[in-house]
């Protein structure tokens, strides 16, 4: 079990135990929303260790309100501007130029999320959902992308090549192959700051949907389903800009090298992280992670060669018009 799993479990036996639990409880586990509850589905190396940004448990809990129901505390947003990417068919969301709060207040997150600071970004576009098996297969068919390291998922022996899962997020793709796909599609990986703004909006929400803890309609997390779900399955969990699946489902690669906000040469205007390093960053948490670990400010430092069954990505590109 790799280091991100250690953040969740603390033991190398966690994966095997989860598989046993899931196998015994398949009939009783929570299911993803039905097709009528879903928004439309949009179609646009060597395994190494992965470590969380902090191995120790957080010293305090974030200021999160307990949900009285599973409904979001704000209306589901309707994106003001969208477009379809010509190369991969992804629906993309316009994120306007402006400031947002990045990171966490002391006592509300983990140490590498401090200090919370104001960042200004130029306008950009970002995929509404994670890149799917269907989309990634088109890049492989063009001879540009490598196939995922494995064709399975956490509980499914056949996943990547199974027509049943075409519109589920591609997994077992390392940072290099994620970037290769985005370039093939005429895009790039989002910066860490771009990803966080798209996830939490300008007000610094704890989660994409607001400041209440997730419920079963917000996200795929904490083994409620036990594996990936179809992209776009949780419209109640949309961010203020309409981005979906930015909490749970699969972690997502971003462009930056990992660095502490307090020690790295971190700009407050269009930051891009350190100039070099040993680890890249993944964001968003996954279907395995607890509510605390799918917060929009949570950071994971990951070897760029790493690939796993709960790690995917989405793409972005800079806007010409601001």
Question: Predicted regions span which residues?
Answer:
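Short, solvent-exposed beta-strand edge segments and adjacent coil->beta transition regions
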Residues: 34, 116, 121-123, 165-167, ...
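Functional-site microenvironments in short loops/helix caps that host divalent-cation chemistry
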Residues: 101, 105-106, 153-300, 307
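Short, structured beta-strand segments at or near domain termini in extracellular proteins/domains
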Residues: 308-322
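Extracellular, beta-strand-rich glycan-interacting domains
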Residues: 132, 247, 255, 316-318
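Ser/Thr-rich, Proline-interspersed low-complexity disordered segments
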Residues: 29-82
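Bacterial N-terminal signal peptides
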Residues: 16-27
